[in-house]
Every structure is written in C-alpha cells, then in structure tokens.
Amino acid sequence: MRRLFDASATAVVAASSAAAKRHGSVQPSEFVFAPAPGEEEAMRNGVKMNLFQAVNSGLDHALSKERTVLLGEDVAFGGVFRCTLDLRKKHGPQKVFDSPLTEQGIVGFAVGMAAVGWHPIAEVQFADYIFPAFDQIVNEAAKYRFRTGSNFHCGMLIRAPCSAVGHGGIYHSQSVEGYFTHCPGLKIVMPSSPSEAKGLLLKCVEENDPCIFFEPKILYRSAVEEVNPDYYTLPLGKGRILVEGRDVTMVTYGSQVYVAAKAAEMARKEGISVELIDLRSLLPWDRQLVADSVKKTGKVIVTHEAPKTSGYGAELVSSITEDCFLSLEAPPTRVCGLDTPFPLHERLYLPNELKLLDAIKSVVHF
C-alpha cells in the first residue's frame, strides 16, 4: 500500500498547486525575492527552473565528482518526484543505483562509504520514513568525526522530501527537522527556492560532515525562478532578509517562507512593516542576522509547519530571548502546526497567512 501511495505522490504534488488556488492559499510563484549581497554573481545568467529541476541540476554537477554516488529507492529511474531523472543514464549504474526499501540500510550503506573516503548522496523517499535510520544518523554519522578526534570524517548527504503536500496525511506530510537539529555533528538545510536548493545542495556535497537536506515537496513544481546552470555554492549557516521592515521580525524557512510573505504583504496593507528572514540553514543557523533584526524591530514571530511544543521554533525563541532580552518590546511569538499528528485537512492544521496576520497584529499592538 505504501508503494501505491508513493507512486501517486507526483500526481498529488502536481494537483496541490491547483487545489491551493481554489482554497485561496499562497503560491510560491507569486513571489520573487532578490538575491542577498554576494549571491547575485553566482545566480546570474540563469535558466528558468522549478525546484526539482534545480535539485536535479545540482545532483548532476555533484555526480561529476570522482567519488560521489547517489543511492536510494527508485533513484535509477528518476525517483518519485523525478529529482534524479536521467542521472543514471548520464553517469552510469556505478554512480546512480537503487537500494532495497530499507531506510536504515540506505543510510548505513552511505555511512560505510563515507568512512572509506567516498561522498554518498542517500535519498530517503519521504522524510516521514527517515526514523528507521535515526540510529545510523544520530549515533553513527553525526558522531563519526568526534569519536575519531577528527582523524576521519563522514562526509555524506541525506536528501529527504518533507512538509505539507496538499493532503498527504500522517505519513507523507510531516516536518521532522526538529528531531535532528538537536544533534551535534549534523548540518541541516531546508531551502525555499530553486536557486537556493542548487547552491546549498552543492555546498553540502563539499562538506566533510553529514548533512541532511530537507526538500519541501510542495515547492518541487510550484517554486520557479532563474537558476544558474553552472556549478555554484551558497554558504551554510547564513540566512537572508527577504523583505526589510521596521515593526516586527518574522523568522521562517522552507515552504513557510511563502506563507509568511503573503502575511507580510497583508500586514503592509494595514500599515505594519514586517521584516522577513529565511533561515535556509537550520543547523548551524544565522543567529547574528536574526538578533540584529530583532534588536531593530523589538518584536519577533517564529513560524514553521512542525508542531509547536518542543519544535525548532522553541530553540529560536530561546536564543533570541538570550540575545535580545533588553530590546524586546513584546513576548516572542510562535505560530506553528498544531500539537497533533498530521491530518488530511491541512488548511486547518497549518499556520496559514491568516493565523500569521493575527499574530502580527497582536505582537505589534502589544
């Protein structure tokens, strides 16, 4: 049954954009954000790509490296979301190959390859199914360099499609980043645009530490922009200000960026200026960028799709409070998913633009 559901995921993603329009939710293609300073050169001379095409382009460049391989369920024929399309044809079966349906085995195999000097890219077909590999990631990959005194490294990349997709339910729509941002030794990334996805993916491939690259699957086809077809990287641990503002700072990442942008635009029409920050990297994260913004505005809202209690936003709010306590003019606020398993009725569960607008008004008028 899982196979049948997974096979239909491509159709679900394609349909979700139209469904979202019918229900009035925000679409990523409505927004174009300017590159941050220093990134414009890397992104110029672009070709229009959606996010899955940008990931495919990044993987193509990565596989051109001598000791890089790609493995996972169905990656040889292109994968459920087509991110690995034609890569086996171009790079051969020794570089791109299928694995059995066992996440623990996929990641464990990748850890072994990394331990002997290869740089594997392991795909977990849905982030919801990453938990059988939790021990391999947290107890093996993340600790490998530490327990060898940095004499050996475990440079590997785990790709995992994540987050809401329209009506994926409890096993195909979860945001699981908070389980891994608590683990020293890992680097965690979640892009919000095609150009970010390619540049950050290639930077992860250059890292000597294990990286988890979460790909918001609702953006695979709905997020479209010009992407440089050549090799380029973007730095890990660096966020960017998408919209400058003076009244309140809003911090987010992944597909929630577009929801936050819609809420910020709605607030602007009511005379409220929102500064919007896309973290991009969750571990490490750009603590200084956020602190500087909050000290300027005096107010902050953190938003993500994952449940609120003990979520990643709690760490952000705690750190912001430590750094900006004397500058805060209102309590830091979190607008997150509900503390329930992920339901089929996503619009009820997710922190949509109307919930964010209410939070913006509440914080600004505190």
Task: Please tell me what each predicted stretch does.
Residues 2-6, 12-210, 214, 217-366, ...:
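Thiamine diphosphate
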